[in-house]
């Protein structure tokens, strides 16, 4: 056991340096996208969101969603799946459990 621990202690600085070197550009990109994408909407963006929601409701009422191409329908389905998945993940996180 002692040789294992000694070997691990000797290699730890090299492993940490490798991890920092590997993660530094990725964390910079991650931080950039979190500051850009996770900001709350500005007051100027709210009317566009309402207009988009009205357009979705209108297409559901008139049946114009049937004229979508397969690619557009697939992309819309993937976006809806992603939104609902993140909603449920956040609900589970907020409740601190799956049940209850």
Swiss-Prot record:
* Subcellular location(s) of the protein: Mitochondrion membrane
Query: What highest taxon heads this organism's lineage?
Result: Eukaryota
Q: Name one Pfam family in it.
A: ATP-synt_G
What stretch or stretches form a coiled coil here? none
Could you provide one GO biological process annotation from this protein's UniProt record? proton motive force-driven ATP synthesis
Give the range the annotation lists for the signal sequence. Answer: none
User: In the UniProt record, does the keyword Metal-binding occur?
Assistant: no
Q: Name one GO molecular function term.
A: proton transmembrane transporter activity
A GO cellular component entry from the record: proton-transporting ATP synthase complex
Q: Which UniProt keywords apply?
A: ATP synthesis, CF(0), Hydrogen ion transport, Ion transport, Membrane, Mitochondrion, Transport
Q: What is its main location?
A: mitochondrion
Spell out the disulfide connections.
none
Under the subunit heading, UniProt states: F-type ATPases have 2 components, CF(1) - the catalytic core - and CF(0) - the membrane proton channel. CF(0) seems to have nine subunits: a, b, c, d, e, f, g, F6 and 8 (or A6L).
Record-stated family: Belongs to the ATPase g subunit family.
Record's function text: Mitochondrial membrane ATP synthase (F(1)F(0) ATP synthase or Complex V) produces ATP from ADP in the presence of a proton gradient across the membrane which is generated by electron transport complexes of the respiratory chain. F-type ATPases consist of two structural domains, F(1) - containing the extramembraneous catalytic core, and F(0) - containing the membrane proton channel, linked together by a central stalk and a peripheral stalk. During catalysis, ATP synthesis in the catalytic domain of F(1) is coupled via a rotary mechanism of the central stalk subunits to proton translocation.
Under which name does UniProt file this protein? ATP synthase subunit g 2, mitochondrial
Gene source species: Homo sapiens
